[in-house]
Design a protein with these regions (language model features):
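Conserved protein kinase catalytic core
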Residues: 3-4, 40, 70, 155, ...
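A short core secondary-structure module
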Residues: 1-43
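Conserved hydrophobic/aromatic beta-strand scaffold that supports enzyme active sites
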Residues: 11-15, 30-32, 57-64, 206
């Protein structure tokens, strides 16, 4: 399994099937257990594109792991429901991080465009550069509003699944566009370590995969729409 933050972790959450089958959010149980328990092995640390996670990403092998009942987290057979409850807010915190990454890259590009001259004027006044900065500003504004709306839905008692799924797709893909444009504005400087943008560029690409790839979220959004329509049709 590809597990983020496994290296150095003292505790791990393991979800296992405890019912005859997992359906309607029941049948799986969460366990909070020590990572040094017999049978839990970190096989290797993966060399991933990004470097932004404490503990990195590791491949873990579970081999005949025996966990006592005292390690049960919450109630038996409710693990899947617990996981679903935390997914929406967790995805939204990722969106907030990605918004910060977008802003950092964009601010770097704007500052550069406001001091670098080309063909007799600041490059930010050339449409080829200025339009990219304008597109960045709009993507960032959109991402911020999407995050606010999803957070509002959660604060007002909604499970937020549709809102957070849309936010996850929109923000992760916007981050890729914003950082790519920022690097382009910086030109040759952008691919060096002289600015932070090259590192952000590597960090943002996995965002469209972490916590569910964009394709899975698009599928889930569409499925909810179909379920809503079936209810309307009776």
């Amino acid at each position: 399994w590809l597990i983020t933050g496994a290296r150095g972790a003292g505790l791990g959450i393991i979800m296992a099937r405890t019912g005859d089958k997992v359906e309607h959010g029941r049948g799986a149980t969460m366990f909070l257990t020590d990572m040094d328990r017999a049978g839990i092995e970190i096989v290797r640390d993966l060399d991933t594109l990004d470097r932004g996670f404490t503990g990195g990403h590791s491949e873990i092998l579970l081999n005949d792991v025996r966990i006592p009942a005292s390690d049960i987290l919450g109630e038996i057979d409710e693990g899947y429901r617990y996981a679903q409850v935390r997914l929406g807010p967790a995805r939204l915190t990722h969106c907030m991080r990605w918004l910060g990454a977008m802003n950092r890259a964009h601010d770097t590009a704007v500052a550069y465009a406001a001091r670098r001259e080309g063909f007799g004027r600041l490059i930010g006044h050339h449409e080829g550069v200025g339009f990219q900065l304008a597109d960045n500003e709009m993507d960032i504004h959109m991402a911020r509003l999407v995050i606010w709306q999803a957070a509002w839905a959660l604060d007002n008692g909604s499970d937020g699944r549709q809102e957070t799924a849309m936010a996850k797709v929109l923000c992760s893909e916007a981050a890729g566009r914003v950082v790519d444009r920022s690097l382009q504005v910086l030109g040759g400087l952008g691919i060096t370590s002289d600015t932070v943008v090259s590192r952000i560029y590597r960090d943002v690409r996995p965002f469209r995969i972490y916590d569910g790839p964009s394709e899975v979220h698009r599928w889930s959004i569409a499925e909810r729409l179909m379920r809503q329509q079936r209810k309307k049709n009776g």
